[in-house]
Amino acid sequence: MSYVQEPFEKLDVMNNFLFNQLSTNPKTKEGFLRCLIRNLLGKEIGKIVIRAENMIYPTLPDKRGVRLDVQIDELNLKDDITTIYDIEPHRDFERDYPKKIRFSQAQIDKNSMSSGNNDFSCLPELFIVNITNYDPFGDDQMVYTFQKKCIEAPEVVYNDGVTILYFNTTGTKGGSDDLKKFLEYLEKSEPEKAVTFATQELQGYVEQIKHDAEIGGNYMTFGDLLDKITAEVAAEAAEKATAEAAAEAAKVAAEKDAIIAEKEAIIAELQAKLDKQQNQ
């Protein structure tokens, strides 16, 4: 079964390929990511370092690392990292995603402290921004914001510097009309959806990528590669299934032969007893 590839010109910002291109292309990456942070978080950010598809490797060979779609480090005048933004678009529901975020946060924090540094006030503020085209919590909110608080005294804030947000492109509650239009554009990135200043800015970045013939060619190559991988995986699965079926058939045949042999032994034993009785 081949991978069904969306036409390049129809890709939306939520598509992993287009999002990656927008986040890495020198012509679009800084403007695009600043636009996201400005309109999703309501923040203007200063000097930044962009780490697209940032891989945080494990410290031990038998442990797991983590890949972030795009990490943005905001710097102060001394070039120290003061805030980290991890932006992740998601088009597929994951039941255990909050725990996946917990793991990602631990990896980000681990990489934010140098060995021997015991001053935890240096740990940057962290915003984990998830953009989903489904409602992860079922309350129809445009945005779900999570920060730690005390259960017994909810007014007590546990300030560990971490804010986790889910922006739901299908939500209708809890946000402004501009935010709703912005989220709708992220899910369906068509010129007709670019009806606000912010969405028109996004549309400009999207057009720069889609009008680039080299990127379009890379996308077609990407699709061919996925087709090849899909075919190889299918062939391996079929080969494994055939081998497993053959092994199972051999097992059944062996069990059948064992039962027949056991019955034949019993019959032979009975026959021997009958022969002995007849000869007496």
Segments from the language model and where they lie:
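Accessory alpha/beta interaction modules
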Residues: 1-163
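Short, charged alpha-helical interaction segments and adjacent helix-coil junctions
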Residues: 2-10, 73-81, 85-90, 177-280
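Alpha-helix N-cap/helix-start motif
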Residues: 30, 97, 175-176, 195
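Short beta-strands and strand-coil junctions in structured, solvent-facing domains, enriched
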Residues: 137, 173-174
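Low-complexity, glycine/alanine/valine/leucine- and proline-rich hydrophobic stretches
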Residues: 151-161, 165, 174, 182-190
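C-terminal regulatory or interaction extensions
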Residues: 169-171
